[in-house]
Amino acid sequence: MNRTVSTLSSTVSDVSVEIPSICNVINTELPTSDVYLYTLKLILLDYINEPRFKEAALLSNRTGTSRVLSDKTNHQQTQHGKKLVVDKQDDMSERDIVQATLRILKGKLAQISGNKNLAPNEMHWKSIVKMYYSMLDSSSADTFSKMGQMEEVVGYFTNIASNELKKMTIKNSRDELFSEVAYFIDLVIDVLPDSCANIIKRLLDYKINLKKGETTVKKKRAASPATVPQYRSISGSTISNKQPSFKVQDISHMKYFMQLFETDETKLHQDVMAVKDDCTNPIFCGELRYLRKKIKKDNGTLTASDFSSDREYNLWKNYELLEIANLMDRFEIGEKVTSHGNRLIPKDAKSVFVRLIGLVLKKECSNAVNAINLSQEALFFFHKSARYWRIEYPSTISSLVYSAANLSVLGDEELNIPITENLFSVIRNKYLCSEDNLDPSAWNAQDRYLWAANLFHTTDQSMRTINNLLTAIFSGTKPKFSPVLSFYYSNIVGDPVMEFYETQSVAVKKYWIKLFKKTLFKASEDYFVSLLQDMLKANAIEIQNVQNLVETIIEAIKAIQKRYNKPLLDEISLPRQCAVFLCEVYGSDSLNLIKTAEKSTMKMTGQKLGPIDALDMYDVLKELRQIYLQVKPKGKFFFNLENYFIKYLTRLCDDVSRNVQKVIKSSLESENWQPVNDQDHFSRSVLDIFKMINESTSMLEKFGWQNEFQLAQMITVILKAFSDGMLSYSAQLMELIQRDLQEGDEPSYSLESSDTRSSLSLNNANVNHEKSRSSRLFEDLKNVVKSTPKMVAPAPYQFKKRTCVLLNDLDKTLFLLESFEEKADPSKISSVIAQYHSSHNLEDNGKSFDDQNMKQVYTLRIIGAENIKGFSKTGLSNTYVSMRNITLQREIGTTKIVARSITPKWDEEFVFESPFGKSNDIMFTIWHHPHSRLKNLAEDDLCGKANMKFTPRKLKDDGFPIDFSLTLNPQGTLYCQISLESEKIDAVSSMGRIYRSFSRSRDRAINLIVNKFSDFIAFAFSRTTLKTVCGHHGSALASDEAVYDAILPLFDYLNANLNILASELSQRLLFMVMLRAWNLVLENADLLLLPALNSAKVNILRSAKKSLWENTLSTTKTVSGYGRPLTQAEIEAVFKWLDALCVDFFHNKGEGPPLAELKNEYYQNILLIPAFYDKSVSELKDEVQRLIPLYEEYLRWFYLKKTPITFTNKSAGTISRKKSLVANIVKEPKEQLERDAEVMNIILRILIAKGQHDYVHRILHDRKELVNTMKNRRAVSRAVTPTGKKGRN
């Protein structure tokens, strides 16, 4: 019989282990008539033995003595505990009686200690408490175990009471001591049975002697019979010998009995008359003797096998024998009847008792819901039935009362915590008074089994209660499991008896865990259905309705998670289980609901569902998926959210891309080019644009898209649109800057003669000249000055405020781009896409788009030219290069003008775009810009031109620069570099394009600004200015004051221009302008100090054109295009100017750029000139010969050993590459070889100044051959082992 609980209605069929059941012990099908009959006989037996029917004579002749004290009432017995039961005093030694009495007395003292009201007064109570603690003290255990006489117990208490009284000040302490000892003796006598008459007699004598004032106890082994007072009625008169009438009205407890069994008086009277003859003392005593006989033969209701030890069995056996003897003392009147027919004591006494007590409890609790309040009538049936039917052993009656409650008032399916707790309290306080009885695991097997069966019944109720609470898990008011669980763990799991049934407990728990999960699933299903029904009440299902449904589900899960943070029964995580079930219930309909909402939107509005609404739906579904995967890691969500909602993300991305360019365009149209505030000098459009792009990317990130590749693609598209818009923005800013700098008057310069003080003003006659052509003033100044003039600083150029705002915008954009890059991380985006393509064997993302919509970007670098045609009297030209795309019929750009040179160096970059795969024919033209006043309105002169066709098939699409040179017509060579990059839908490429565009624009704008006062810098560092200091021949020794006075106008002029800029530019930009101006100063000083290195070739060519006679007549050591070498005095004057400008003007005690940036590499190279300038030609040549091998080693390092350019990952194309790929090559630390090469160049230039043109030309020719050799070797090396990777892959 596999049962899990004790009631017939609560069974678990799938538990394979046998579960203790009340039905296995108690006959729950017992007819009520049997209970009725035995209970009626019990009442009648007690009725005929009431004191009013007793004769006023000595009690039992068998014992030869009787107690002086009358039996305590039933209420008193209940209040103070059980009596010791001894059949005959001779059956047990007095020592055994004393030890048994101490055990029962201990429980009685415990009750009094816990309730002060049970003691006569506080003094008595304190002594009782002290005695009780002494009995608990392990150190006193040996003393109590050795006690063999009751007088020893009384004497021990006397000492305790005496010691307590000594602590207090009491007048009659002697009388108080006697009173307390007498009270204690009464407690002991109350425990002893009538069969212990000798011991009781001695205690009574001791008590009488106390009243007489005696202080010693006389120990007597024998005692004469004591007289017993007559029983008196309530009125105090002596009871006469009455006979029972057996009338219902005369029988005690009959009214309660009729209510208990719902019978009428007539029928009851008939039943009384029918059974009264069976309710006699002889019959009852005969049945008691039969029970005693069976117990003595070890064949009673319990046997030794039911106990854990013989000692425990003997304790029970002695207890029963003593109690039976006690009953026989009361009921036996001399007549003996042999009876074992169970006429008074039921054969199945336990089942009858349980049914009876069940009826009593139902009646008593009919008006009380949360407590068991027993009346005196009820207590009569509790205790009389247990005593007369011999089931009053503490463990037995406890388990039976528990069973009766479970089969009656606690018979509901769910747990009644208040009544159950009250029941446990009644059992502990009334039946398990002694601590030895409180542990059910120490009980006999039958009682332990029945107790366990009741616990399983309560377990079943607890589990059903929890199961019912689980049905309300999704309600607004969350169910509270803690009261049930607290009761369950403290009273059931914590009960020691459950250790004997651990297997059964595990099986039951497993069953209920399984059932709980089913209940949770059903609750989740019902909850979702209710939500769905609410949603379907609307006319149409909209996406917002579906989103609200999912949000409600998420909130419900979170509410459960917040409320229940501990597993139910340490097994079920309610938040996890509810989340799994609720998600799975919703998941089966999730996609259909979304599709229905999409169709509904199309039907109502005629348009597709908006991307924002759809992505909001994705957001909540993503959160639900995250919850589901957290609670079920190995689970699979119901459909791929990203693959379904990607169409909406794509639409949103397209909208954002269009909006990006729209915002940039509108920002330009509404811009007034005014600073944002006094501290920030840039305009509002910069902030608006970056606010827009940050919000755009943040909006995508806000959705938390879980497909990294898809998100990277979308951001890439937005960055491409951003790149296109920003390139347009950069171009328009640069156009405005050029327009501003082209407008306005050119500055006019004045020279005052030292003799006449007359001044000459030279103004620009054509203020609207072409934007790329600079002032023609320098040659005019040089031709006009006929004496030693004094230079006067002109008025500063009036830069427009708008120009400065535009420049600030360019710089601020670069700064914000760096911040945006850290946030957007384009390198990671590109890497994600590349890894996806690699893992899926797809082509490069940039090539997956239609080539017709893509562009190719050419970066053209104009480096310099050689041997171009000269136009001035000195054979020099003021040259610039213009470039035009003949294929697209579009101007590419124009370089700055390099004055007075046939070997100009421009080193400028230009970018142009072309349709993908289209060749471009570029026309390069070098012009001479004359400064002559007579040609102000004339066209510029042509120095040379050349064509070059760039075909994408012949250029590597990797962004690496390729050197090429063009032979000019009619003469000269132009040196350039070209690099090609194909436009790609790539984050790194897009950001790199923006940065390079703005970086180039900013640098070009700075150059244009600095060029506005470049002519005066060139004039200040000229031979004309030197003549004012050192004379026409450079031999005059001028004072330091004269040297500094000569350059002072330049100080004033630069200061005036920079002050204008300082008020409108940021410090960062101002320093950049100052450093560019300083480099311009160094360039002019360098040209003044030494002839250019390529002038050796020019002089050789010109010498070859002269006749022998002309060369012989030329006695002056002049260099073509440079003039005579400077004297030592002139050299010193120039370096004094440089030092003054560097330290006093530009650095200005830390107010300007740092000295480390001012004393740059260029400056350090110029400082080499004085070290070699005064050396002889032979010494210089020897130094050159020493350096030639080092220069060869330098070339091998530069072309073959230098770290090759490779771009991978983040370095591939991020905005940190600055201007362009070629300009962003990682520079190696400057090594000694490179330094030696610079030294060699300086020495060669000095040799040119000393007239060693042939020697220098030969050295340069050998170096050129060596360079070509190294380039060829590098080309071969790269062909064998490619090192240049694509810049953005």
Curated annotation (Swiss-Prot):
Residues 748-762 have a biased composition (Low complexity). PROSITE patterns: C2, MHD1, MHD2. Residues 615-733 form the MHD1 domain. SMART domains: C2. The keyword Cytoplasm applies. It is found in: Cytoplasm. Coiled coil: none annotated. Residues 834-966 form the C2 domain. Residues 745-774 are annotated as: Disordered. Residues 1044-1184 form the MHD2 domain. It comes from the Eukaryota. Keywords: Cytoplasm. CDD domains: C2_Munc13_fungal. Its main location: cytoplasm. One of its GO terms (cellular component) is cytoplasm. PANTHER family: ADENYLATE CYCLASE ACTIVATION PROTEIN GIT1, C2 DOMAIN PROTEIN (AFU_ORTHOLOGUE AFUA_7G02350). Present with 300 molecules/cell in log phase SD medium. This is Uncharacterized protein YOR296W. It comes from Saccharomyces cerevisiae (strain ATCC 204508 / S288c).
